[in-house]
Swiss-Prot record:
The gene is lacA. One of its GO terms (molecular function) is identical protein binding. InterPro entries: Hexapep, Hexapep_transf_CS, LacA-like, Mac_dom, Trimer_LpxA-like_sf. PANTHER family: ACETYLTRANSFERASE YJL218W-RELATED, GALACTOSIDE O-ACETYLTRANSFERASE. The active site is at H115. NCBIfam families: PRK09527.1. Its main location: cytoplasm. Homotrimer. GO terms for cellular component: cytoplasm. Catalyzes the CoA-dependent transfer of an acetyl group to the 6-O-methyl position of a range of galactosides, glucosides, and lactosides. May assist cellular detoxification by acetylating non-metabolizable pyranosides, thereby preventing their reentry into the cell. This is Galactoside O-acetyltransferase. It comes from the Bacteria. Its EC number is 2.3.1.18. It comes from Escherichia coli (strain K12). Belongs to the transferase hexapeptide repeat family.
Length: 203
């Protein structure tokens, strides 16, 4: 018996996405996405409502700056106090989980999906998906790309322009192409917010 596409996705097997109701699910998500991206800046309540409708789960005080782009939206889980700047792109053929207090800078891409390297294995659009998990208190810099199957640990910072191909542990600063750990986050970081600029008082 052939395995349904949704089961193939969960099992990490190759799949195609033009059957079994998947196009209809994408259309629903992209219709909401279109409405959100074309809303007026003054329509704050409308945007708040659409954020809750576009994504699978959304915590309190979550905000996304338009435009935002995704495949379905219904596979994206967002925690509390989330903020994403403009041009966030999420390829969510499978689950994307974002923790609490996460900040995402402009032009970031999270993609759970890739294609086989050999051309014969992707001639019909075959692809694979592995979930992405972003921990709590993570800050992702601008123009970062996060590849399929990656987990970023709690409290970590991903430097601008990084391509993240492997898991990043908690409590580190990581950057580069490919992304690698630069250093651990330490007590000095509690007192200096940028280079030698010292924190004088709470904002």
């Amino acid at each position: 018996m052939n395995m349904p596409m949704t089961e193939r996705i969960r099992a990490g097997k190759l799949f195609t996405d033009m059957c079994e109701g998947l196009p209809e699910k994408r259309l629903r998500g992209k219709t909401l996405m279109y409405e959100f991206n074309h809303s007026h800046p003054s329509e704050v309540e409308k945007r708040e409502s659409l954020i809750k409708e576009m994504f699978a789960t959304v915590g309190e005080n979550a905000w996304v700056e338009p435009p935002v782009y995704f495949s379905y939206g219904s596979n994206i889980h967002i925690g509390r106090n989330f903020y994403a700047n403009f041009n966030l792109t999420i390829v969510d053929d499978y689950t994307v989980t974002i923790g609490d207090n996460v900040l995402i800078a402009p032009n970031v891409t999270l993609s759970v999906t890739g294609h086989p390297v050999h051309h014969e294995l992707r001639k019909n659009g075959e692809m694979y998906s592995f979930p992405i998990t972003i921990g709590n208190n993570v800050w992702i810099g601008s123009h970062v790309v996060i590849n399929p199957g990656v987990t970023i640990g709690d409290n970590s910072v991903i430097g601008a322009g990084s391509i993240v191909t492997k898991d990043i542990p908690p409590n580190v600063v990581a950057a580069g192409v490919p992304c690698r750990v630069i250093r651990e986050i330490n007590d000095r970081d509690k007192h200096y917010y940028f280079k030698d600029y010292k924190v004088e008082s709470s904002v």
